[in-house]
Amino acid sequence: MRKIIVGSRRSKLALTQSQQFIDQLKRKHPNLEIEIKEIVTKGDQIVNVQLSKVGGKGLFVKEIEQALYDGTIDFAIHSLKDVPSVLPEGLTLGCIPVREDARDAYIAKHHIPLHELKPGSIVGTSSLRRGAQLLDQYPHLEIKWIRGNIDTRLAKLRDEDYDAIILAAAGLNRMGWDKSIVTEYLNPELMLPAIGQGALGIECRSDDAEVLALLKSVHDEETELCTEAERTFLRLMDGSCQVPIAGHATMVGESIEFTGLIMSPDGKEKYKVTHSGGNPIEIGTQVAKAMEQNGAKAIIETLNQDI
């Protein structure tokens, strides 16, 4: 087997989860020689603007995909939620390993439960999806934009006027944060996760048989089935980072149960549909069609026009 060059974003979380995946791969292939190549993406360079206002898709993957085309890397390790639902020609997801915790984590300055936050309390998030769901259930709260890595956001919670912040549980777990910092984990019934949240997507060239065979050894079929339902829904709804869109699928016995959600950013319009079955593409499609019939597509079209 040739030496493998792996592409990763330069952030601490990206490098940590990349190393964790490599360790998983090396347990299956102890003699594998592998090296990480750090790549800065457009999304990494945009630090003072809300990503939903930038528009476009693939803000955290395009430069890495170019490295795949150029042949300077052999595969790329992405957070699946950053990967557009339609991949460029010649590239494929070679594997999706076992998913981490898909939930969101609510962290309050004084560990005040979410339902006890007083009117006007400030909750920090970089996600329209989280903001819309919070405003739907707790319209008395104020949502304030926050960016930065986990350390930066926790420091802002401590030092600035935020009463609480919401982060992805998967990122906290991968970075080794103690669960005691989390005030409460938000179950999908309360806060539906982003499409693909908690999962990694390992992207490679479609014609690289050697790498595809290597990646297959750490692929998880259950995670693939669930995320395929989610990503089918995302693709059909043409969801992007300027649309509050969410979706989460789980296996219930032999069946895939998927719930999709589309909201207006202010939380006042809400479309939520659940379907279950054995075929992930059919389930994602059924939820998307039900959404269109209910009028959810109008929210997306309006928001896309505003960019």
UniProtKB/Swiss-Prot annotation:
One of its GO terms (molecular function) is hydroxymethylbilane synthase activity. The porphobilinogen subunits are added to the dipyrromethane group. Binds 1 dipyrromethane group covalently. It comes from the Bacteria. This is Porphobilinogen deaminase. It catalyses: 4 porphobilinogen + H2O = hydroxymethylbilane + 4 NH4(+). NCBIfam families: hemC. Coiled coil: none annotated. Belongs to the HMBS family. Tetrapolymerization of the monopyrrole PBG into the hydroxymethylbilane pre-uroporphyrinogen in several discrete steps. Pathway: Porphyrin-containing compound metabolism; protoporphyrin-IX biosynthesis; coproporphyrinogen-III from 5-aminolevulinate: step 2/4. Keywords: Porphyrin biosynthesis, Transferase. The gene is hemC. Disulfide bonds: none annotated. CDD domains: PBP2_EcHMBS_like (cd13646). GO terms for biological process: protoporphyrinogen IX biosynthetic process. Its cofactor is dipyrromethane. It is an enzyme of class 2 (transferase). It comes from Macrococcus caseolyticus (strain JCSC5402). HAMAP family: Porphobil_deam. The modification S-(dipyrrolylmethanemethyl)cysteine is found at C241. InterPro entries: HemC, Porphobilin_deaminase_cofac_BS, Porphobilin_deaminase_N, Porphobilinogen_deaminase_C, Porphobilinogen_deaminase_C_sf. Its EC number is 2.5.1.61.
